């Protein structure tokens, strides 16, 4: 099963809108790939989902549902490499994680990460590109 990293903003977008492209990407990652997390990425997901601006749209049940889904199937790794390659240093944790997980892709909407693709053989793609890739690879009905 190929390894993939999904960033916190994609997870937040999935939580905010059921049946959206980001939610489909998250579900496909959990079903057809091995999704990887690190403690810093998990902390960012929790922080983003807990932001006050999302509280009016995200109830505690939805946050619990998304976190349970991720924690049930995602793999937790501790990166040993510390990378300083992204324009936004806060995004380097995703590069660290992708290297530790031997991921083929990072699913993100972040322009700083997307502009790096490919980086050390790792593709950066948005949720729609990832959904299309998995649909083609797994020959899923359109």
Predicted regions and their residues:
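Short, well-structured N-terminal submotif of metal-dependent ribonuclease cores
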Residues: 1-37
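Short, flexible loop segments at the rims of nucleotide/cofactor-binding pockets, characterized by
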Residues: 12-14, 54, 81-87
């Amino acid at each position: 099963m190929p390894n993939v990293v999904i960033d916190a903003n994609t997870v937040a977008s999935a939580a905010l809108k059921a049946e959206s492209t980001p939610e489909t990407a998250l579900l496909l990652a959990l079903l057809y790939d091995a999704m990887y997390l690190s403690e810093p990425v998990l902390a960012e997901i929790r922080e983003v989902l807990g932001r006050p601006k999302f509280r009016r749209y995200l109830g505690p049940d939805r946050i619990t549902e998304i976190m349970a889904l991720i924690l049930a199937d995602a793999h937790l790794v501790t990166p040993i490499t510390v990378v300083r390659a992204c324009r936004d240093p806060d995004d380097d944790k995703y590069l660290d994680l992708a290297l530790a997980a031997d991921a083929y892709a990072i699913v993100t909407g972040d322009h700083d990460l997307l502009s790096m693709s490919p980086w050390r053989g790792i593709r950066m793609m948005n949720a729609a590109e990832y959904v299309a890739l998995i649909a083609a690879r797994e020959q899923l009905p359109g």
